[in-house]
Amino acid sequence: HRSITPGWVLHNYPSVEFVIKKLRHTPCLAGCAYCNAQLDVHRSLTSLFGYDSFRTYEGEPLQERAAQAAVEGRSLLAIFPTGGGKSLTFQLPALMAGLSVHGLTVVISPLQSLMKDQVDNLAERGITEAVTINGMLDPITRALAIEKVQDGTAALLYISPEMLRSATIERILLARNVVRFV
């Protein structure tokens, strides 16, 4: 299990996550060993996904730029063709934030089959920090997914838009450091 900031701390001291992010998820000096190991998109691409490089489009490193922008906390819009690597542009930064600040990235998708495919594809790569919570889950699978979000094991949460109305989802999101909505 990962150590996450307790919900009561987030509620009573909301700036604590800002301080943690500044210390653990903001690049500092060139040559910093921590930043080179934890905040470098190329190293993380290799260590987390096993890829040597990002895809390019007509010689432009669009996938890398999108991933780097997300790591830096910037808002972005990435438009790639089907199968062009859009998912990596949010999955890589999400996993990096999960490791550095125990952050949670919430991915909102209306397609339950797509959410399941995303989680299954990550699991096939040995990445177990992604879960989905939707109305099609049996109670045991749902409870296990909620537990992974609550205890900080999950860095990526895939939910459908209607799940945002759920009191359970609201409660678990308020108790976590949500770093990005996709």
What are these regions (language model features)?
Residues 72, 95, 120, 137-181:
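Conserved helix/coil segment N-terminal to the catalytic DExD/H
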Residues 31-81:
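Conserved pre-motif I regulatory segment
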Residues 79-84, 89-130, 134, 152-155:
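Conserved SF1/SF2 helicase motif Ia
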Residues 56-61, 88, 136-140, 164:
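Conserved phosphate-coordination/catalytic loops
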Residues 46-49, 127, 149-152:
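Conserved NTP-binding/hydrolysis module of P-loop NTPases
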Residues 8-14, 173, 180-182:
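Structured, non-catalytic alpha/beta "coupling" segments that mediate domain-domain communication
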Residues 1-35:
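N-terminal accessory nucleic-acid engagement/regulatory domains that precede
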Residues 53-57, 82-84, 132-137, 159:
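Short, flexible loop segments at the rims of nucleotide/cofactor-binding pockets, characterized by
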